[in-house]
């Protein structure tokens, strides 16, 4: 049986002021998860949740810094983030919002104030790939691969 660990030891240095949460095998793209994690890293928890709500409503795009090949420019994105390419990863934003609500519940259970929580660590890692093959004509087959992503977040109470 495997054991899962966080990719950092921030929470072990100050366990009474931090809360953490994980999500394994989320059915979202690892590339979209990487871009979303980069944007909300360092935000206050309430700001990050509001930002993800706007992404889900397709009101505010997510800047794509690394995986931006053939990605269209979005109005106002370059002024705010310094990069004009972006998209609206709605499905990934829903899973990130679920993760942030989970870490908020964990923080409340530990007695931390939600308004003072800041995201000090958030990361996404490639998970397993579920491989399926759709039979086609003349004995061929088309791959239908479903990628999974592991997510982790650590929040800390700041003054």
Swiss-Prot record:
Name this protein carries in UniProt: Large ribosomal subunit protein uL22
SUPFAM superfamilies per record: Ribosomal protein L22
PANTHER family assigned to the protein according to its UniProt record, in alphabetical order: 60S RIBOSOMAL PROTEIN L17
Described purpose of this protein according to its UniProt entry: This protein binds specifically to 23S rRNA. It makes multiple contacts with different domains of the 23S rRNA in the assembled 50S subunit and ribosome.
Any GO CC annotation of this UniProt entry: cytosolic large ribosomal subunit
GO term, biological process aspect, one: cytoplasmic translation
Gene behind this protein: rpl22
Species for this entry: Ignicoccus hospitalis (strain KIN4/I / DSM 18386 / JCM 14125)
Glycosyltransferase keyword on record: no
Subunit and interaction comment: Part of the 50S ribosomal subunit.
Assigned keywords, A-Z: Ribonucleoprotein, Ribosomal protein, RNA-binding, rRNA-binding
Family, per entry: Belongs to the universal ribosomal protein uL22 family.
CDD domains, A to Z: Ribosomal_L22
Keyword Iron-sulfur set for record: no
